[in-house]
């Protein structure tokens, strides 16, 4: 009987990508098959996120729930990876001594040998080092699960924003070689993938070396990926405004496979707060980039990230953020109350803003962002959208669902499963708060 793997993933798309590669790796080296039930597993993997305090607390809550499983089955291996593992290392076992393996984002390729060593020696295995991009040399070709796929093009970040743990948990920026990324995309396309999302913590900082020694940027990579037979749609995330270049704007204008949607985190509309965050740009510079992009690609959808309640944020600072939202007209975006992360410079800043006021500001900001996003959805009613059909609707098995270029879910009545994995033209009939409804055009 095949041994079972249970994997739980917290956090960003990069973690989702890493988790899929762990499944590939352990399937090839240890013949582990994925199970949906932790109690049936021989190996449990928790891929963690440390971007906010609540996410970190969630890790230990989940590990606590698995403690009884480990007591009932001492042969079970529990492994913790991702950014919490990278940040805390062996200290994880101080709170959860039944954890067998602790590994970082850059050492996931060592999982098979670490699991074997834990079983043989009965000793904990810990490796949270940063061996640059070495892990990709040890991973098998990715399996394909649906028409969309993530492709990691770079790891880490060298921006050192004062609130962010990424440089400390994933290391400095390192780009994958250009040809390695291209080979992965070709493999995915040959196995039915139609849409790829190029991933990096600062993806527009990509600088990949080609086989002839040249250095290619993200715009170069996008143009070559677009030429791969079978790839009809390209996304990328997450970007930094400082490196949103003219060449990338030109790619948006000239490459039809590149979607008319950009996620460009700004974090705040206050120049004073942006300086304290060490974002190294102003709101004027941010808006200038977007004006240039919208001139090149009319109708492009812009989403962003916002942090409310950064230490020292005044009412005027928050008002400036709300003004930026009005000036730009964002699509649905992500926003959070600031969460101090240990080891980051911002964690040492004085913070005298009451928590209740932070939550009040967040609610106001989210309300306006949702209004703007819903207005964009309503403007799409009556239009014909080309969507990539991804699966059956989660609520109605008589419906299929897919995504538009601007990343909206569309549900439409259709009982033809052969449409899954294909593009279809759908007339948008109605806008709902978090999705669209449409009719398939024959």
Curated annotation (Swiss-Prot):
It catalyses: N(6)-dimethylallyladenosine(37) in tRNA + (sulfur carrier)-SH + AH2 + 2 S-adenosyl-L-methionine = 2-methylsulfanyl-N(6)-dimethylallyladenosine(37) in tRNA + (sulfur carrier)-H + 5'-deoxyadenosine + L-methionine + A + S-adenosyl-L-homocysteine + 2 H(+). [4Fe-4S] cluster 1 binds at residues 12, 49, 83. Keywords: 4Fe-4S, Cytoplasm, Iron, Iron-sulfur, Metal-binding, S-adenosyl-L-methionine, Transferase, tRNA processing. Its cofactor is [4Fe-4S] cluster. Its main location: cytoplasm. It comes from the Bacteria. CDD domains: Radical_SAM. Pfam families: Radical_SAM, TRAM, UPF0004. Its EC number is 2.8.4.3. PROSITE patterns: MTTASE_N, MTTASE_RADICAL, RADICAL_SAM, TRAM. SUPFAM superfamilies: Radical SAM enzymes (SSF102114). Residues 143-375 form the Radical SAM core domain. Binds 2 [4Fe-4S] clusters. One cluster is coordinated with 3 cysteines and an exchangeable S-adenosyl-L-methionine. [4Fe-4S] cluster 2 binds at residues 157, 161, 164. Residues 3-120 form the MTTase N-terminal domain. It is found in: Cytoplasm. One of its GO terms (molecular function) is N6-isopentenyladenosine methylthiotransferase activity. It is an enzyme of class 2 (transferase). Belongs to the methylthiotransferase family. MiaB subfamily. Monomer. This is tRNA-2-methylthio-N(6)-dimethylallyladenosine synthase. It comes from Pseudomonas savastanoi pv. phaseolicola (strain 1448A / Race 6). The lineage of its organism: Bacteria, Pseudomonadati, Pseudomonadota, Gammaproteobacteria, Pseudomonadales. The gene is miaB.
């Amino acid at each position: 009987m095949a041994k079972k793997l249970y994997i739980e993933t917290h956090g960003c798309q990069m973690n989702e990508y890493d988790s899929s590669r762990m499944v590939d790796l352990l399937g090839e080296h240890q013949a582990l098959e994925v199970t949906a039930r932790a109690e049936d597993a021989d190996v449990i993997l928790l891929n963690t996120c440390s971007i906010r305090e609540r996410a970190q607390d969630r890790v230990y809550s989940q590990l606590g729930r698995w403690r009884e499983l480990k007591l009932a089955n001492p042969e079970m291996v529990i492994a913790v990876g991702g950014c919490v593992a990278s940040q805390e290392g062996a200290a994880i076992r101080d709170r959860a001594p039944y954890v067998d393996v602790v590994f970082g984002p850059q050492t996931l390729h060592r999982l098979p040998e670490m699991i074997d060593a834990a079983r043989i020696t009965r000793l904990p295995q810990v490796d949270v080092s940063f061996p640059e991009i070495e892990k990709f040399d040890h991973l098998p070709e990715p399996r394909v699960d649906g028409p969309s796929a993530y492709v990691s093009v770079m790891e880490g970040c060298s921006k050192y924003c004062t609130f962010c743990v990424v440089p400390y948990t994933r290391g400095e920026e390192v780009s994958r070689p250009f040809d390695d990324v291209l080979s992965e995309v070709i493999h995915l396309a040959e196995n039915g993938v139609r849409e790829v999302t190029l991933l990096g913590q600062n993806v527009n900082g990509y600088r990949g070396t080609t086989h002839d020694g040249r250095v290619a940027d993200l715009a170069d990579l996008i143009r070559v990926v677009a030429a791969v037979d079978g790839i009809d749609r390209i996304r990328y995330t997450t970007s930094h405004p400082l490196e949103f270049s003219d060449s990338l704007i030109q790619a948006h204008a000239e490459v039809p496979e590149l979607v008319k949607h950009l996620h460009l985190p700004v974090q705040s509309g206050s120049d004073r707060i942006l300086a304290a965050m060490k974002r190294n740009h102003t709101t004027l510079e941010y808006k200038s980039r977007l004006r240039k992009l919208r001139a090149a690609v009319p109708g492009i959808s812009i989403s962003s990230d916002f942090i409310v309640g950064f230490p020292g944020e005044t009412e005027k600072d928050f008002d400036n953020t709300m003004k930026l939202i009005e000036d730009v007209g964002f699509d649905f975006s992500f926003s959070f109350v600031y969460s101090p992360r240990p080891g980051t410079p911002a964690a040492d800043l004085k913070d005298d803003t009451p928590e209740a006021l932070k939550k009040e500001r967040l609610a106001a900001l989210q309300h306006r962002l949702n209004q703007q996003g819903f207005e964009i959805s309503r403007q799409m009613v009556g239009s014909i959208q080309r969507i990539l059909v991804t699966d059956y609707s989660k609520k109605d098995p008589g419906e299929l669902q897919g995504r538009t270029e601007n990343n909206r879910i569309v549900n439409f009545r259709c009982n033809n499963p052969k449409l899954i994995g294909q593009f279809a033209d759908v007339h948008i009939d109605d806008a709902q708060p978090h999705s669209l409804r449409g009719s398939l055009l024959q």
